[in-house]
Regions:
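C-terminal interaction appendages of subunits in large macromolecular complexes
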Residues: 2-322
Length: 322
């Protein structure tokens, strides 16, 4: 099953735009924009190697920690203040696990644990005994509880209805191609509707000069709308679509047709039709629309990254060895 962690909208859109601007962009270039997963609960991702492996292959593991700070008190005691916990970790269970570790004496030096979470944000305070080593205790909490968690990444998506594991660039490529298709299909639909409306307006434009004759012909037909439509087609050489639009109009409305109003609408439609045809004939223009729409989405909904990424001592990327 797919398991793609949440990402930052601004970063992902910037990555998509970078790909549109340069389809030959490499993974390292994309990662300048897409730093890594970004969880709504914040936290700290430990190291870049797990992120890079996941983005390069479509599979990987990322180490995620809660955000904790060691606070020195005036009386010489220390506290561990936790303000963020890993994504999908249950706060109550985390605190209960910490308490169990204290009872079992697997972690020593903790005198109390309090949940001081409020509307202002999360806050779990671990009060330490005087002389306790806060750094050691914090590392023990990382090791023995879900204050440090592993997030698996499996980037599986449907490609032509076939499940495939995709790396980051492939995922972005498929998404941009999909957006390209959406713009083309939407434009083709709008173009078709505009051409259909323009065709009817062409008929109405011609009907203005002979409106009295058309009304007389319609009134002379006693066999209903079908007979009137056929009579208009035969007498005035309108096609079926145009004749149908004319016959369906109320006679009073037909008599009051204004040629200037028809011409204005027709001119607007013809300009739109030209623009849409030009767009569909130019791949670069279609991608420009995709880019502009993504930019508008980013500007409206984008926000700052919540999850930070810390370099781990001794971590070496493959590129560093080349």
């Amino acid at each position: 099953a797919t398991n793609i962690p949440p990402h930052n909208l601004t970063e992902v859109i910037n990555g998509c735009i970078a790909y549109i601007d340069d389809p030959e962009i490499e993974l390292s270039g994309l990662m300048e924009h897409i730093k890594g997963p970004d969880f709504p609960t914040g936290g700290v991702i430990m190291g870049h190697s797990g992120i890079r492996a996941a983005y390069a292959t479509g599979r990987g593991k990322i180490t995620l920690r809660g955000r904790a700070e060691i606070v020195e008190n005036k009386d010489g005691t220390q506290e561990i203040v936790i303000t963020e916990i890993p994504y999908m970790v249950n706060k109550a269970r985390l605190i209960a696990k910490m308490a169990d570790l204290v009872k079992e004496k697997r972690v020593e030096g903790i005198r109390d644990i309090k949940d001081l979470t409020s509307r202002k944000g999360m806050k779990i305070v671990v009060y330490l005994r005087k002389g306790a080593n806060a750094s050691v205790i914090l590392n023990q909490l990382y090791s023995f509880t879900q204050l440090q968690d592993t997030v698996g990444v499996i980037m599986i998506a449907l490609d032509n209805n076939t499940p495939k594991t995709l790396n980051l660039k492939q995922m972005i490529q498929k998404y941009v191609e999909f957006q390209d298709e959406i713009v083309r299909r939407r434009t083709a639909f709008d173009l078709q509707k505009a051409e259909e409306r323009a065709h009817i307006l062409d008929g109405l434009h011609r009907a203005v000069d002979i409106v009295d004759e058309i009304i007389a012909t319609i009134r002379a037909c006693k066999g209903g709308m079908a007979e009137a439509r056929q009579a208009v087609m035969d007498t005035f050489q309108f096609d079926e679509v145009q004749a149908d639009a004319i016959v369906k109009m109320q006679l009073g409305k037909l008599a009051g047709l204004e040629i200037l109003k028809i011409e204005n609408e027709l001119n607007e439609l013809n300009a739109q039709i030209k623009n849409w045809k030009d767009l569909l004939a130019d791949d670069a223009k279609v991608l420009a629309v995709v880019k502009n729409e993504l930019t508008a989405l980013r500007d409206k909904y984008g926000d700052e990254r919540r999850t930070s990424i810390e370099h781990v001592s001794g971590e070496v990327d493959i590129e560093d060895l080349i």
